[in-house]
């Protein structure tokens, strides 16, 4: 297991990882607006497919609201649960944006490159950082270093009304050593 090799792999594949993030950012998964329910569903489908592309046994799970995405990777050692959310805040008032918030762009700034678009920082960027780290680790080392459960919800920005009931119903599956 080589952290240096994994970091080098991340650097060498940064463009592809950025492209995947930009693709997810283009999905207007606004959980608080019923007009975007199909987009929330699309974001969940996108995440399931992306997790499956790196060998994660991932599924979309129905809730009374927006779906959960749950994925598992078997492994030795401790069980890690990673939580994130794929929904985003509304963009109103739209006239305050200098571009379409769902047309993310990589921009050069005096402090370096940044990604501007709704969800880049909260929470799609953070969510994909973990997924991309797992993708790189697996590419370099063949397997992930421990058992991992990926747990993504689509209602965090609307108060997570389905989260606690889902966690109670799936407590055994979601139980982990670390989260």
Residue ranges and their predicted role:
Residues 114, 121-179:
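Acidic/histidine-rich catalytic neighborhood of metal-dependent amide-processing enzymes
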Residues 2-120, 137-146:
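Acidic/His- and Gly-rich active-site-bordering loop/insert found
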């Amino acid at each position: 297991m080589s952290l240096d090799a994994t970091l080098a792999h991340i650097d060498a594949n940064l463009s592809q990882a950025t492209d995947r993030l930009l693709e997810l950012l283009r999905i207007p998964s606004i959980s608080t607006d019923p007009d975007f329910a199909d987009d929330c569903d699309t974001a969940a489908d996108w995440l399931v497919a992306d997790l499956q592309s790196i060998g994660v046994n991932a599924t979309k799970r129905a809730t009374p609201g927006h779906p959960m995405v749950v994925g598992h990777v078997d492994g030795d050692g401790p069980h890690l649960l990673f939580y994130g959310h794929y929904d985003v805040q509304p963009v109103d008032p739209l006239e305050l944006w200098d571009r379409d918030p769902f047309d993310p762009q990589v921009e050069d700034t005096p402090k370096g490159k940044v990604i501007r678009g709704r969800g880049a920082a909260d929470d799609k960027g953070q969510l994909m950082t973990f997924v991309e780290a797992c993708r790189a680790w697996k590419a370099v080392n063949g397997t992930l270093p421990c058992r991992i459960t990926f747990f993504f919800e689509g209602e965090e920005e609307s108060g997570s009304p389905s989260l606690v009931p889902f966690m109670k119903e799936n407590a055994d599956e979601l139980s982990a050593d670390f989260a």
